[in-house]
């Protein structure tokens, strides 16, 4: 049943590999992963260069500060969420990157490279084994690394499916405006 606001939760079981082999749509750098109830996204698991674990925590603080100083610093990426984890497997540390966003995979990764190249910043990915050293000028190599380390999900769920981050922000602004209007009427 449709709830208030016109949304209905949705789940999508994903085929092994992340997309239907009979419905492959090619992007600039390979198959386009489908939009799901959780929008677009990807998960990367890659081994970090030994001894670099502190760099990841410092980098997280840098992202926190950058967003606090300039809230729209990552806006071009159309992100909903990012989640980063470090974990050990047989004594080696791995990095897991999980991102949910509103653009397709190719656009997201191209935009990410452009943000870093324009700002002069480095990416925490430079601390991953096998990450291309020329990534700032070689978007295809960056994207190949991401695709090679992507671990497709096999289930995605959305409480408010297929809704963009911009739509959510607009709905929250509208709610605040209505609340303010009702307060003014009292």
Which ranges hold each PLM region?
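Short S/T/G/P-rich N-terminal loop/turn motif that feeds into the first structured element of a domain
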Residues: 1-94, 100-116, 131-186
């Amino acid at each position: 049943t449709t709830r208030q606001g016109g949304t209905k939760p949705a789940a999508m079981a994903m085929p092994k590999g992340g997309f239907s082999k009979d419905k492959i749509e090619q992007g600039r750098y390979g198959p386009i992963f489908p939009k799901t109830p959780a929008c677009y996204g990807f998960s990367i698991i890659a081994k970090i260069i030994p001894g670099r674990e502190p760099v990841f925590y410092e980098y997280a603080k840098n992202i926190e500060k950058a967003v606090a100083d300039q809230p729209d610093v990552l806006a071009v990426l159309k992100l909903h969420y990012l989640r980063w984890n470090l974990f050990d497997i047989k004594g080696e540390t791995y990095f897991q990157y999980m991102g949910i966003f509103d653009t397709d995979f190719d656009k997201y990764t191209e935009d990410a490279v452009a943000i870093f190249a324009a700002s002069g910043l480095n990416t925490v990915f430079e601390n991953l084994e096998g990450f291309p050293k020329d990534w700032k000028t070689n978007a295809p190599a960056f994207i190949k690394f991401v695709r090679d380390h992507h671990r497709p999900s096999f289930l995605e769920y959305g409480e408010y499916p297929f809704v963009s981050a911009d739509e959510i922000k607009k709905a929250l602004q509208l709610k605040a405006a209505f609340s303010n209007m009702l307060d003014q009427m009292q």
